[in-house]
Amino acid sequence: MKKDIHPNYVEFNATCSCGNVVTTRSTIGKDIHLDVCSACHPFYTGKQKAAETGGRVDKFNKRFAAIGKK
């Protein structure tokens, strides 16, 4: 690698709105603030709400179920 052409790869803190702080390394060189992280995101905490199970396919099947039974 050539010297003095690569950006500095330094440690920085990513602070979430829930208060969780993650230390990682990057070339941005300054601390950042996150809206969500793995400690408070509903997918990772298990508090995720199920999406609507019925959709267009279910509506189609209900509408034409009687025709298919003949």
UniProtKB/Swiss-Prot annotation:
Q: Which Gene3D superfamilies match?
A: Ribosomal protein L31
On the tree of life, the source organism's domain of life is Bacteria
The protein's matches in InterPro entries, at most eight in alphabetical order, are given as: Ribosomal_bL28/bL31-like_sf (IPR034704), Ribosomal_bL31 (IPR002150), Ribosomal_bL31_A (IPR027491), Ribosomal_bL31_sf (IPR042105)
Keywords (alphabetical) are: Metal-binding, Ribonucleoprotein, Ribosomal protein, RNA-binding, rRNA-binding, Zinc
MF terms (GO), sorted A to Z: metal ion binding; rRNA binding; structural constituent of ribosome
* Free-text comment on the cofactor: Binds 1 zinc ion per subunit.
Q: Which cofactor does it need?
A: Zn(2+)
SUPFAM superfamilies assigned: L28p-like
Question: Where on this chain does Zn(2+) bind?
Answer: C16, C18, C37, C40
Looking up Pfam families in the UniProt record yields: Ribosomal_L31
Q: What GO terms in the biological process aspect are recorded for it?
A: translation
* One term under GO cellular component: ribosome
Question: So what does this one do?
Answer: Binds the 23S rRNA.
Give the family this protein belongs to, as stated in its UniProt record: Belongs to the bacterial ribosomal protein bL31 family. Type A subfamily.
Note the NCBIfam families from the entry.
L31, PRK00019.1, PRK00528.1
Assembly information from the UniProt record? Part of the 50S ribosomal subunit.
Q: What is this protein called?
A: Large ribosomal subunit protein bL31
Q: Which organism is it from?
A: Colwellia psychrerythraea (strain 34H / ATCC BAA-681) (Vibrio psychroerythus)
